């Protein structure tokens, strides 16, 4: 017989309920409030205050609730469906389908969203490059298979577009399963993403959407849902990993997870920490990030978009994410303003596996030389601004010309942006990327005007465009 209590107090999305003292729900248990119209409001227990009183965070709207309503303890945490039945479906934080394609049957396994991370013995630590088909990422900050990568950027510099392109590329080229968590972002973007994935075909009978699980807790949802939707998606991804698959987990946007935690923390009455964030910021982030890992059975490769408030990388939210990552992709507004997309800053982006023993001598050499040329150009910009190009040595003039071509060559037409740009998307394998930049550095493109390097695939595309213009 489940324990029953009554609502004592409602403050925003936080509900205080009283249970019999010998039947107090455990921390993280789901408690349900029947709403009379056949629906139920699920809340998650966050605090036990003594004398049978608990504080819980609602996963839905608290409109229409009142004191004295009955509360029922389910006796376990929120549990969500896992397995092949979830592919090609869209869920909310509770694991209920929101795509209008009918409910998930009772025969489908459900797992609690709170679980311990894999032990050290189970974890797999081998480093291996994960090809994305995006030149600037593969060359400068290669992803680790089974690693964690974050895409940092302020508002409107293209984080979501990069994430969408990665989903499309990986589904087409590597035919893997993906789990997408929309955390506190725009509902319109989520809707667009679903439609684009339904249109993007892997083959005649399969779309990208058919190989993806989507979980949404968007901007209009209460903070409880935005706080837990990442764990819901992660639980679904862990199932596929434990079945021996290599799975991709996309989280857009991890900052909104922190933001939701901050809202909940304030409503629970905790004293705020630095810059007004919750005192449990590091713990909450660790609980999520430590579960995103590879085991000896399978791997979870995660890509997370991180909104950087006011472009300030020292803000506690992005700074906390940094410590968990294998690679960081930094999107820069000044590059986006020049219409170079993806607007990745190659000098601020890093990867743990950009190592000659992992990516190979040639890749490492080319990447370092590209960085050296770009850094030299950056150093010379002040001189050029004051004295002009004429005052530079011949060697520096050549460096500047090549650096400008490299910057433009890092731009790339994306499949998901095709409808806006009118250019078909290009997937460039790592081998081609390294070869293309090696040719550029060797001087093979010195005679080609820099405009021909903009929005091209590999070096052969640049040559073809230039030769076509000469006819």
UniProtKB/Swiss-Prot annotation:
Record bears the keyword Ion transport: yes
One GO term in the molecular function aspect is: proton-transporting ATP synthase activity, rotational mechanism
Which controlled-vocabulary keywords does the entry list? Answer: ATP synthesis, ATP-binding, Cell membrane, CF(1), Hydrogen ion transport, Ion transport, Membrane, Nucleotide-binding, Translocase, Transport
Keyword Zinc recorded:
no
Topological category with respect to the lipid bilayer: Peripheral membrane protein
Top EC class for this record: translocase
> What Pfam families does the record tag this protein with?
ATP-synt_ab, ATP-synt_ab_N, ATP-synt_VA_C
Query: EC number(s) for this protein?
Result: 7.1.2.2
Q: Please write the reaction equations for the catalytic activity of this protein.
A: ATP + H2O + 4 H(+)(in) = ADP + phosphate + 5 H(+)(out)
Which residues of the sequence carry a binding annotation for ATP? 153-160
Primary subcellular site in the record, as a coarse category: membrane
Subcellular location(s) per record = Cell membrane
Q: Name one GO cellular component term.
A: proton-transporting ATP synthase complex
**Per its UniProt entry, which superkingdom is the organism in?**
Bacteria
Q: How does it assemble?
A: F-type ATPases have 2 components, CF(1) - the catalytic core - and CF(0) - the membrane proton channel. CF(1) has five subunits: alpha(3), beta(3), gamma(1), delta(1), epsilon(1). CF(0) has four main subunits: a(1), b(1), b'(1) and c(9-12).
The UniProt similarity line reads: Belongs to the ATPase alpha/beta chains family.
Q: Which NCBIfam families match?
A: atpD
The free-text function statement in the UniProt record for this protein reads: Produces ATP from ADP in the presence of a proton gradient across the membrane. The catalytic sites are hosted primarily by the beta subunits.
PANTHER family xref list: ATP SYNTHASE, ATP SYNTHASE SUBUNIT BETA, MITOCHONDRIAL
Q: What is this protein called?
A: ATP synthase subunit beta
Whose protein is this, by species?
Chloroflexus aurantiacus (strain ATCC 29366 / DSM 635 / J-10-fl)
Q: Which lineage? A: Bacteria, Bacillati, Chloroflexota, Chloroflexia, Chloroflexales
